[in-house]
Design a protein with these regions (language model features):
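Structural and coupling elements of P-loop NTPases
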Residues: 1-275
Length: 275
């Protein structure tokens, strides 16, 4: 998502991507946050497919928006390959994409065909020891801390010994891979083995964090990770002295607020909580 609230997630998820679709509104054009997400994708070495979307709008100006998009790529120092981006015109609401503004507008096949043609599969080695970069994390009442990432090399098997190392190569945690899940659409499906290239959810390490490398015990070199931009806003929470204090909401005590903030910081890498 382009919204700034999801900036931290966008940065992390890019490390799992082989390609990207840059969606631009055909009427509104390039938005401030478009520059942010595109700059991150370009730095990651991705070669985006530009999709001028919402051509069903009466005030669409697709050709002008395409020029604005090219200028944006140039301003972000895109290389020659990235500047030679393919373009499609689409309406997500109507369910079609075409190579031309006035194309037949039948279905999304042109987009799917272009993804297959333009996005090359990653060359990953399944014979090396297991290693993956922890990209996202969340707490589960049943599994405990769960880590999401793409397996960079090797295979992961349930119950195998694993460890977590930070960006400096220091061991953060060690344990057993208790559960592995793979995503099928939005559903998590338990599996026994995950292979290089799979995006998986693993459980078994309670101290591991985002940007740590989850790996076999013999692996000592961390996977490089892109540093997250630090939070740009600081909030101090104090006692509510308003005459209306205590009349709204159910969680009113400082302890309840603290517990909720701690929980959020465990799941959201864009938040830092101190007390």
């Amino acid at each position: 998502p382009g919204h700034r609230d999801f900036a931290a997630e966008v940065e992390r998820v890019l490390s799992m991507a082989d390609g990207a679709l840059l969606l631009i509104d055909s009427a509104e054009g390039v938005m401030p946050q478009t520059k942010f997400v595109l700059s991150k994708a370009l730095k990651q070495g991705l070669k985006p497919i530009v999709v001028i979307n919402k051509l069903d709008k009466a005030d669409q100006r697709a050709n002008e928006v395409l020029d604005e998009t090219f200028d944006l790529f140039v301003s972000l120092d895109a290389n020659e390959e990235q500047l030679d981006f393919p373009v499609l015109y689409a309406s997500g609401r109507s369910g079609w994409a075409d190579n031309e503004v006035d194309g037949p507008r039948k279905n999304l096949n042109p987009l799917l065909d272009l993804i297959v043609e333009h996005v090359k599969p990653a060359d990953l080695d399944k014979t090396k020891p297991f290693a993956m970069l922890s990209t996202l994390l969340y707490s589960d009442s049943f599994l405990g801390r769960s880590l999401v990432g793409r397996i960079a090399q090797g295979t992961a098997k349930a119950n195998q010994p694993i460890k977590a190392i930070n960006l400096n190569g220091e061991k953060v945690d060690e344990g057993k891979l208790t559960k592995i899940f793979r995503y099928e659409g939005t559903k998590k499906v338990p599996i026994d083995v995950g292979e290089a290239g799979d995006i998986v959810v693993v459980a078994g390490l309670e101290k591991a964090n985002v940007a740590d490398t989850i790996c076999n015990l013999e692996v000592n070199d961390p996977i490089p990770a892109t540093p997250i931009d630090p939070p740009t806003m600081s909030i101090t929470i104090t006692v509510n002295t308003s005459p209306l204090a205590g009349t709204e909401g159910k969680k009113l005590t400082s302890t309840q607020i603290r517990d909720r903030l701690v929980q959020e910081a465990q799941n959201n890498v864009g938040i830092t909580f101190t007390e």
